[in-house]
């Protein structure tokens, strides 16, 4: 089956600034996708190109096997939920949601039925006659989502839609968005710079930097096997250290050999090693793979964040549910599976091929 939407070598610039560089993406129907990256990486520009608010300088945008790069927004089966909601302040909730349906000249009874259903979906039944000015940020966001889904788009675009909400409301809206996507089966494309939000919501994530896709995959794939230092740093906290591959399944870190699960990398190849803070355990000095001194400890609610310095002066961050005494000598321990090897300069295609070879090896 062909993708619902594809970008084929799409580039876009504004004046002298290149925003997107030969972007290639495929969007399958019925999944929740997230474009994740820092400000200025080009993620919102991709959304604008899908919606038809901007046109590509080069390359093709294909929707259901037809090019739509120059198609006007009103001809696309796409709706957008903006960060600032973009609601009409002079209209009540019902009329805001019904606006697009009235333009389509649907009957009053059909409009009422669709608006009522949309309000039920976003858990705002009974709010039809409320004025927009008197609503909270979370309620306005739900109205904006209802206005989008009532038109039954095939793709729903969400541009930093939760960033203006406080933490509790944002969490509630995350559950609502996942529930809506699952129930309606609409393809969601969500833009955010918040990696925790991306991990919680997405079926698939595109990690972006400087107008290019750095990595595409499921949240678990990207978190567990980042393709490069940028992705490892951007998706969660990481201990990133330099190493050298000794042979298959053995990496040398700062002069000490460690078992790992990586293979297919040239011997003596310089690599970068990622070990997540939650994968490191504080143990007795005798039980540790190496020794370290506790420098500091912060309570983060669900865990303690403990900073240690090993005897060679390198810092390690550990997330633990157990306290540690600042100044104490401890052992640090991690399993071979906790070590993730990154090869500098490796393309995503080369990286994916290497990871697939591990799976083939273990299934052989």
Curated annotation (Swiss-Prot):
Enzyme class: translocase
CDD domains: ABC_PotA_N
Main location: membrane
Subcellular location: Cell membrane
Enzyme Commission number, as recorded: 7.6.2.11
Swiss-Prot/TrEMBL keywords: ATP-binding, Cell membrane, Membrane, Nucleotide-binding, Translocase, Transport
InterPro entries: AAA+_ATPase (IPR003593), ABC_SmlMolc_Importer (IPR050093), ABC_transporter-like_ATP-bd (IPR003439), ABC_transporter-like_CS (IPR017871), Mo/tungstate-bd_C_term_dom (IPR008995), P-loop_NTPase (IPR027417), PotA-like (IPR005893), PotA_ATP-bd (IPR017879)
Residue ranges of every copy of the ABC transporter domain listed in the record: 5-235
SUPFAM superfamilies: MOP-like, P-loop containing nucleoside triphosphate hydrolases
A cellular component annotation (GO) from this entry: ATP-binding cassette (ABC) transporter complex
Membrane-topology annotation of the record: Peripheral membrane protein
Cited NCBIfam families: potA
Function noted in UniProt: Part of the ABC transporter complex PotABCD involved in spermidine/putrescine import. Responsible for energy coupling to the transport system.
Subunit structure: The complex is composed of two ATP-binding proteins (PotA), two transmembrane proteins (PotB and PotC) and a solute-binding protein (PotD).
Protein name according to UniProt: Spermidine/putrescine import ATP-binding protein PotA
UniProt source species: Staphylococcus epidermidis (strain ATCC 35984 / DSM 28319 / BCRC 17069 / CCUG 31568 / BM 3577 / RP62A)
Source lineage: Bacteria, Bacillati, Bacillota, Bacilli, Bacillales
Gene: potA
